[in-house]
């Protein structure tokens, strides 16, 4: 082994690897030694979670969260146990098997693996709430039969669709020009402050900010917490749709409606003192492993923007002076009506998930369904704690 890092390589003899992608390797720059360990992969065919800098995997065992061993079971999508990972508070260090308390966590994430789904209502119609057929894809393979192209006016053009047969690789798994094996989503609504965003249970969510303020604060997470090899960003409308569809599949709650976070003080996870542990009906999986606060709590702005009448970025009162990079938001066609549902896109959990097309009361499970229009150009999702039955993961307004 050379002491010159530019000349150092890896030589492996007499070892049979089924696939190097199933191994996590690290090297010691002082000694030049390389160690590799086989990483755990469940039987669902979901892509293995990618841990970014300062993220540690956790699993729930004996009524507590512990640091997971990457070589042992720590998630199981067939059992509706989605992968969880956290960024710990500064100065907190843990070893495999150590307990992690909610107070020790700064950021909490859930892994959404790449998938395609069978299109069930792709032609601007009405459809009853139903199970969505999701199939995990390997690596960055794009195996869906349907392709869609975004147009300059914010609309999209898709190839021929046959409901119940055509499949579509969910578009949330393409970020700019990069195909993704999956992405991490915050487990709870954001909290803390714009100078130090947190994502954790048992605290009041951060509210009363402009879209641009949220956007900048969430981007700054990567430097605040040292996740420098990730591209932290505010959730896009299409990413919300990807989580919603996974919830509606056999890997989540399925056709069971997600419960509403009715806490009037806007506590994440539905309350204080680890209330999220009993409020599992508010999770996308119906257990502690899913994503919370997607129904009720506070309205959640997402990066879904309606163009202005000249087909340009329309900030309205969001606080942007220039448009963000196009990869950070989904663009929609201008219209003066909030019931012009045909402006929705495949995968975003808008026009496909309507029991009554063209009606604001027509969302699945009676969720509110109102598009951005001439008065306001941004999507908000999930409803808020005081809306009652119109709240839900398919709520948009």
Label for each model-derived stretch:
Residues 2-14:
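Extracellular carbohydrate recognition
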Residues 12-27, 218, 300-303:
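Extracellular/surface-associated beta-sandwich interaction domains
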Residues 16-113, 117-122, 229-232:
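GGW-centered surface loops in extracellular recognition modules
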Residues 21-23, 237-241, 268-271, 276-278, ...:
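C-terminal, surface-exposed recognition/capping segments
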Residues 99-106, 139-294, 298:
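Short aromatic-cysteine micro-motif
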Residues 115-118, 188-192, 304-307:
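Acidic glycine-/aspartate-rich tracts in secreted/extracellular proteins
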Residues 122-176, 185, 339-396:
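Long, low-complexity, polar/charged, intrinsically disordered or flexibly structured peripheral segments
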